[in-house]
Amino acid sequence: MNYSDPTKLGLLACPGGERFAEQVLKRLSTIYRHRFERKVQVMADRYHISKELVTRKINFANDVYSSMLCIPGNVNEYRAPRFKVNARFTWFANGEIKTEILDSIRGKDLYIFQDVENRQPCRFNDGRDERELSVNDHVMNTLVTIDAAIQAGAERITLVMPAYPYSRQHKKKGREGLTAARLGQIFENYGVQRIITLDIHSREIENCFNKLRLENLHASYQVIEKLAGIIDVGDENLVVLSPDTGAVDRNKFYASTLQKPLAMLYKERDYSKVTKDATDSNITEMKLLGDI
């Protein structure tokens, strides 16, 4: 934590990523407050002065080095940094989307939150309109938001997307495109320095960038924790089943952690058939491999 300039970090949520960003903001606020209180206690003990005086001196230093004239709030109390960046999202009648950033972000380390799989109604036009967006709508909303951030002078842009769009199009058959790689390169060319995503469909996508860094996080601990509250993970009949070959490595981790056997489904598909939803599958045959 930088005590002289605690507001360099900025979080900007696209309409699809608002709920996710709210949880991160709450966690950030808690972390910063705990670190501040710990810093105050250590400094007070070291210099044998009161915590109130340390708090006042830290606030004074923050005011001196802040780009603002002065940081709002009581100088004798902890002043929480303001991470949230406000923006106005406009949906036009012809389907175009516009992002207008309402706060200064010049020189900030900006994190843009977007959940392209969000199917809940998203608010536009100052909350007057609500619309359910497709993946393509969310992607376009992300692009115009990135552009607005660049035009507003953000120093660094990190894109936080729990679901990486078009990640299943990471390999091609015949004359198909490699859309997963191309979309990532579009983000890179726009000026995004880093993408943070969760359990990306294929790690091959990480190799399609020149300078952009893709961080593929895993929710393994959280999954096991929730699973332990639902079933008996110590059951001797428990087997970890990988739904396809692409998920084998991920399921190997769960099998080894839970010390359970691993099985796998091998699927054969009819690629001449285009599926519309989960009930309309192009899978022609499935084989269960493993001792269950």
Question: Predicted regions span which residues?
Answer:
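PRPP-associated nucleotide enzymes
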Residues: 1-292
